[in-house]
């Protein structure tokens, strides 16, 4: 218990007749919440980047298949368009989920960073993602 208290946890109690310890964890500070929101934004950008790489790889495979005549152009063109639609849908979902997580983390301290995020916020209100991360 003393080691736990030395590491900054002030409310540490041993539960009577048990080997369990009850530790009261303090609420995060505003700076910590901002760091969490920043990390959420970073994860969001990383996921969008991975999706772009996946799409690029798939398009390269389609081009290679066209060059080797494994597939016909009338098949490749809709496939590329479908990939584009899938990417746009995935990016939209990632942004909605990221926005909801930041709103949940920051609570009343949340503010939109730009007009695009404001539009996304209006879309989020009508989205099933609005129920995510509710406490």
Model-derived features: positions:
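Ribosome-associated translation termination/rescue signal centered on the conserved GGQ peptidyl-tRNA hydrolysis loop
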Residues: 1-33
């Amino acid at each position: 218990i003393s080691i736990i208290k030395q590491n900054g946890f002030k409310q540490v109690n041993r539960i009577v007749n048990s080997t369990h310890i009850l530790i009261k964890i303090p609420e995060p500070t505003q700076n910590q919440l901002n760091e969490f929101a920043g990390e959420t934004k970073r994860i969001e950008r990383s996921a969008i980047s991975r999706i772009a790489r996946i799409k690029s790889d798939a398009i390269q495979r389609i081009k290679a298949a066209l060059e080797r005549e494994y597939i016909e152009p009338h098949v490749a063109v809709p496939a590329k368009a479908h990939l584009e639609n899938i990417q746009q849908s995935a990016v939209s979902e990632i942004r909605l989920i990221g926005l909801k997580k930041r709103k949940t983390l920051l609570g009343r301290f949340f503010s939109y960073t730009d007009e695009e995020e404001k539009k996304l916020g209006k879309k989020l209100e009508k989205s099933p993602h609005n129920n995510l991360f509710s406490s």
